[in-house]
Amino acid sequence: RADWLYGRFEMSAQLPAGKGLWPAFWMLPSEEKYGGWAASGEIDIMEFKGHEPEQVHGTLHYGAPWPKNIYKGKPYRLPKGDFTDGFHVFALEWERDAFRWFVDGVQVQEQKEWSSAGGPFPAPFDQKYFLVLNLAVGGGFGGPVGSDTRFPAQFQVDYVRVLQR
């Protein structure tokens, strides 16, 4: 499995509608250098709740191990239409001292402050991370499956790109 320290991570995808569907494009550390989740960090490039089709989330998880961890991020609401009606491009630019999230080429969030119980800034985001793409069904973030959620559900991915300087 490939892993990276810094870069631009991009995916073009069409997201599935339905209560309880939870597609995500995210990153975990290759090693738990600072301890168990989330002390070693997690980078959520895009998370989606199938029952909120016009909104995606980008979040950093860090600090101490769960349940004393910190998470910081915000949702982005599409100005017109929703994320289930066609392909959209989700991207993250990760530098030593900043994270920037993009949707369809528009910057929607920036974070420059985080901390770690295990080391000085920029820990825990000073180590290599690998990519994860998944479609969860149910769970704490996605919520329970709705009686009208249609299966099979598809998280359609056109491409994933990783760019580095």
Say what each PLM segment does.
Residues 1-165:
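GH16 jelly-roll
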